[in-house]
Amino acid sequence: MSPKRIISTPLAPQPIGPYSQAVQVGNTVYLSGQIGMNVRTNEMVTGPIRDEAQQAFTNMKAVVEASGAKMSDVVKVNIFIRNFNDFPAINDVMKEFFQSPFPARSTVGVAELPKNARVEIESIVVIE
């Protein structure tokens, strides 16, 4: 088994619990969930869900790039949302960060998320 490497960047919010921003094993990187927290203020982005989702994807991108990968290397995205009425807006934001062919994806409705977030995004990256 390949040794694991911990990925950490100051360009994304620091973990709010006992976990790493990402862990790399071999050429696969497993990203922890990112929420719409502004890294400079450590406050949640307020306003439309679109703004919160953009911040969550921006945070995810920072961790992806800290691993040495690109967003086009993302193979799987898991999105957790509190309200499925937000689904179309989150889809629109995702298209700002990914182009076809899109990564595989699951979207799961949940009752609550950390910091009262409305969306949380985790992903798996394979570095070629």
UniProtKB/Swiss-Prot annotation:
It is found in: Cytoplasm. GO terms for cellular component: cytoplasm; cytosol. Changing G33A: Loss of imine deaminase activity. InterPro entries: RidA, RidA_CS, RutC-like_sf, YjgF/YER057c/UK114. One of its GO terms (molecular function) is 2-iminopropanoate deaminase activity. Its EC number is 3.5.99.10. Transmembrane segments: none annotated. Keywords: Allergen, Cytoplasm, Hydrolase. It comes from the Eukaryota. The keyword Cytoplasm applies. It catalyses: 2-iminobutanoate + H2O = 2-oxobutanoate + NH4(+); 2-iminopropanoate + H2O = pyruvate + NH4(+). GO terms for biological process: 2-oxobutyrate biosynthetic process. It holds the Pfam family Ribonuc_L-PSP. Belongs to the RutC family. Catalyzes the hydrolytic deamination of enamine/imine intermediates that form during the course of normal metabolism. May facilitate the release of ammonia from these potentially toxic reactive metabolites, reducing their impact on cellular components. It may act on enamine/imine intermediates formed by several types of pyridoxal-5'-phosphate-dependent dehydratases including L-threonine dehydratase. Preferentially digests Leu and Met in cooperation with L-amino acid oxidase, but digests Phe poorly. NCBIfam families: Rid family detoxifying hydrolase. This is 2-iminobutanoate/2-iminopropanoate deaminase. It comes from Dermatophagoides farinae (American house dust mite).
